[in-house]
Amino acid sequence: LAALRGTRVGLADNWLRHVHDVKLRHRRRLDHLSVAEQEDALISWLINSPARVKFLVTSVMFFPDNKDNGTDAWKAFPEQRLRILDTIRKHRIKNVIVVTGDVHGSLTSRLRHSEDADFEVQTIVSSPFCNSALLPYASASSFILDQPLAQTESGDYHLEWTSKVISQDNFAYLEVEREHIRVEYRDRDGEHLYSVNLPLQL
C-alpha cells in the first residue's frame, strides 16, 4: 500500500519499485523476440555453454505435468518441450536442472528415456513460500506419473520421483557440490523440513 501511495516504509518502496523496473525492462527486451527466437537462443545456450551444471529456470512447470487442464505450464506446449528434450538427449548434454514453481507444492523428480540410459534431466520445484487458503497444496496425486511425459518413435520420456512432495509453505536452499546438488526444503522460519541429494553426471 505504501508503494502504491508513493510513501516510504524503510526500503520497501525502493525494493518494490526496483522489482517493477526490472520486470518492465525485461518485458521490453523480450517483447520484440519471437517464440522461435527465444527457443533458438535457449537451445544454443544448452549446446554451447561450457558450464558443467546448467540451471534452466522457468516460472511454470516443465515437468511433471499437473492433472488439471490448465494452460499456464509447459504441458500446453508439448511440441516445444519435446524439441528441447530431444536437443538435450541428441547432444548428450549432462546435468540440466530445471528450477520451477507455481504448483503450491515442492518436489524433485527426474526424467529418463526408455532407449537411452544416459539421458537424464532433473527438476527442482520450490513453491509456495506463502500459500493462500483459497489454493490447495499439491500432493503426489496432483501429478501425472502413470504415463510417459512424451512418446516418440525413438522411445518414451518417463518420470521418476526423487523426493516426496512438500505440501506446506516452504522454500528451497540449494548447494552445488562436485557429485550432487543438495536440496533442502525449509519452512517460512527457516527450519528444516526435508532434504535430498540429486546426483550429478560426472
Task: List each model region and its residues.
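Long, structured stretches of catalytic cores involved in phosphate-ester chemistry, encompassing
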Residues: 1-202
